[in-house]
Amino acid sequence: ISLFHGFFEYDIVNDKITRKLDLPIPEANKDMALGDHVLNSGHHGIALSGDDQTICVAGTMDGYIAIVDRATFEYKTIPLSDNPKEAKPYWATSSKDGTKAYVSISGLDKVSVVDYATGKIVAEVPVGNHPQRVRNGQLRLK
């Protein structure tokens, strides 16, 4: 499913796919050659909110962040640039308290902070060249 623009819900106990969500492909990307997908990914990063109710998807090749209601699969997209091939959101990780998602925007050299409750970007942090994976950490000072 590497080149898929969306995701599947999978029942581990019964070993079957229970639902599939196709997320939108911008018009500019509909004729994209398979070899033009970064790391063979349509959408790459995915995170789940702390209450397990909301999913954040990094639409890597589509230039948006998707916020998805886990129960209904209804979603909204947050466009990151006028050119869907420019932003390249790459990874999504939930905050330690589970209320926000951190999404690395590799093509724009920043990390966006998305509030799960509102589905809006609440902060953007400029970072070094081409951020990829995002992790929570703790700095201990003596």
Predicted regions and their residues:
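Predominantly soluble domains enriched in secretory-pathway, periplasmic, or organellar proteins
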Residues: 1-142
